[in-house]
Regions:
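C-terminal accessory module of base-excision DNA glycosylases/AP lyases that mediates lesion recognition
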Residues: 1-32, 113-122, 130-214
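Structure-specific DNA junction-binding interface
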Residues: 1-88, 213
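Hydrophobic (often cysteine-bearing) scaffold residues that line and stabilize catalytic clefts
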Residues: 39, 43, 56, 94, ...
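Short, hydrophobic/amphipathic alpha-helical patches that form generic packing surfaces
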Residues: 45-54, 100, 142, 201-209
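Active-site catalytic microenvironments for nucleophilic, acid-base chemistry
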Residues: 53, 66, 104, 143, ...
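Alpha-helix N-cap and coil->helix boundary residues
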Residues: 58-62, 76, 93, 135, ...
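Alpha-helical ds-nucleic-acid-binding substructure associated with the helix-hairpin-helix region
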Residues: 64-130
């Protein structure tokens, strides 16, 4: 069992070396977005994370670009947005979530300018933005360079953590308390192999899919 785990860790480290430069480039892009704090960019990233629930990230980003380029992301009606989300699961619900998120944007922008604690920002997002859970909030913060060492726990990551023995089983659902518990375990593992937890989810995703995205 130990030799198997050692082999898997070796594969993780090898994959990390392969894509480390790409990951660091991504994080520089994320940090640039966060440092600009451009309201339009921030809203685009927030809406992207709303769309990613049970949907392919690449498809979601294409939809965001379409909505953004046509001005519908900020001003489109429910019908206009929904019609352009047909390639995304639960497109009607998510169209409504985008419209609802508009009313919280000014408060969010103020929070991002005033608050340095990423965990507090994540907590606010989960509480105040419909369609945003712990995973989506962490994803959003990562994409604007504010995630620190928080972990995006999607099904790919959870499968990998289970395979490594970091969690005994894959939970059917993740309450905020359970999310933080698993996140801490992942952070501890990441520290033990000298890979930032925020980089590790990229590595796990790459191992599962062969891709690096957002």
């Amino acid at each position: 069992m130990k030799s198997k785990r050692k082999k898997e860790i070796g594969e993780i480290l090898a994959a990390y070396e392969q894509i480390r430069n790409d990951i660091e480039k991504k994080f520089r892009q994320f940090e640039n977005t966060g440092s600009r704090l451009n309201k339009k960019e921030i809203f685009r990233e927030l809406c992207f994370c709303i769309l990613t629930v049970q949907s392919r990230a690449e498809n979601c980003w294409k939809c965001i670009e379409l909505l953004d380029n046509t001005g519908l992301l900020e001003k489109g009606s429910f019908e206009e947005i929904s019609n352009r989300l047909k390639g995304v699961r639960f497109h009607n619900n998510k169209a409504q979530r985008i419209i609802e998120a508009r009313s919280s944007l000014e408060t969010l922008m103020h929070l991002l300018k005033q608050e340095n604690d990423s965990k507090k920002i994540r907590q606010w997002l989960v509480k105040n933005i419909k369609g945003i859970g712990m995973k989506e909030a962490t994803h959003f913060l990562r994409n604007i360079g504010l995630s620190d060492d928080l972990a995006i726990l999607d099904r790919h990551i959870l499968r990998k953590l289970n395979k490594l023995g970091i969690i005994k089983k894959i939970p059917e659902s993740l309450s905020p308390k359970k999310y933080i518990e698993i996140e801490k375990r992942m952070q501890k593992f990441a520290k033990s192999i000298d890979v930032p937890a925020s980089h590790l989810d990229f590595v796990f995703w790459y191992q599962e899919t062969g891709r690096i995205f957002k």
